[in-house]
Regions:
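An acidic, Gly/Ser/Thr/Pro-rich helix-cap/linker signature
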Residues: 1-67
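Catalytic and binding regions of secreted/periplasmic enzymes and modules that target cell-wall glycans
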Residues: 130-157
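Extracytoplasmic
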Residues: 10, 67-73, 77, 92, ...
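Catalytic cores of secreted or luminal carbohydrate-active enzymes
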Residues: 175-195, 231
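Solvent-exposed, acidic/flexible segments
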Residues: 41, 45-56, 65-68, 87-95, ...
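Substrate-binding/active-site groove segments that recognize
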Residues: 90-111, 123-125, 130, 154-157
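Short, functionally critical alpha-helical segments immediately adjacent to catalytic or ligand/cofactor-binding
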Residues: 68-83, 143-149, 236-240
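Primarily a LysM-type cell-wall glycan-binding module
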Residues: 201-230
Length: 242
């Protein structure tokens, strides 16, 4: 008989070295909710595991270079599923930058170039945001929450509610779930078989080999450009989305 089991809630867990207070019933239940969703939404979680193998090494390297905790790679996973998606508000790329914020943190965004689509450059820009936010909050959990809820809103919530503890703050639905979503994904990724996910190395998506090509003029037809270099069109579009 096919049986469905409740996913195991870990005895302890932390985000960026900052422990989550799992002894509190509300905290355990919120984490349980996200573990249930990610454990039994098999197609989604399996796809994320496969895709992370392609992009996590690059993200981890840049995070280390900028002294950002490794757990922030899961933030990118939750933000965009490591895809160059566009939100209804226009947030774009792995790290879901709005145009104004992207420019503020050094990304070129105009009619011809949009570096939000560049996984490496956008990761560097995200690190700059995270470092600036940490200089204000001195708390990585609040930094992650501010990435979702906005620096101003989190700052106002901290001041009005007189606490710097994310787990005590009253926030909107999305931001109040945000850290728990990250913790759930982290828990499953670190213990996949415990949650029923079995993957072999051959199941994982490999890195797409690439090289930098400098051009001296505009490229009016990217598909023709791909053909001229003998590059598979869909591969080029994945690296440089239209």
């Amino acid at each position: 008989n096919y049986r469905i089991f409740a996913p195991e809630i870990p005895d302890q867990i932390d985000f960026a070295g900052e422990p989550a207070p799992l002894h509190l019933v509300t905290v355990r239940e919120k984490l349980d909710r996200e573990l249930l969703i990610n454990t039994y939404w098999h197609t989604s979680t399996l796809t994320l595991m496969k895709r992370a193998n392609r992009y996590f090494p690059m993200i981890e390297s840049i995070l280390r270079e900028h002294n950002i905790p490794d757990d922030f790679k899961y933030l990118a996973l939750v933000e965009s599923r490591l895809e160059n998606v566009i939100s209804p508000r226009g947030a774009t790329g792995f790290w879901q930058f709005l145009k104004e914020t992207a420019r503020e943190y050094g990304l070129e965004v105009n009619l011809e170039v949009d570096e939000r689509y560049d996984p490496e450059k956008s990761t560097v820009a995200a690190c700059e945001y995270l470092k600036k936010a940490f200089s204000e909050y001195q708390n990585w959990t609040l930094v992650a929450a501010s990435y979702n809820g906005g620096n101003r809103r989190i700052g106002e919530a901290v001041e009005e509610q007189n606490t710097t503890d994310y787990y005590e703050l009253w926030l909107n639905e999305e931001t109040s779930r945000y850290i728990y979503r990250i913790l759930a994904v982290k828990t499953i990724f670190q213990n996949p078989t415990r949650y029923g996910f079995y993957l072999t190395p051959s199941d994982l998506y490999p890195e797409i080999p690439s090289e930098e090509i400098r051009v001296e003029k505009d490229i009016p037809d990217l598909m023709a450009f791909a053909d001229s270099l003998g590059i598979f069109r869909l591969i080029l579009n994945k690296i440089k989305p239209l």
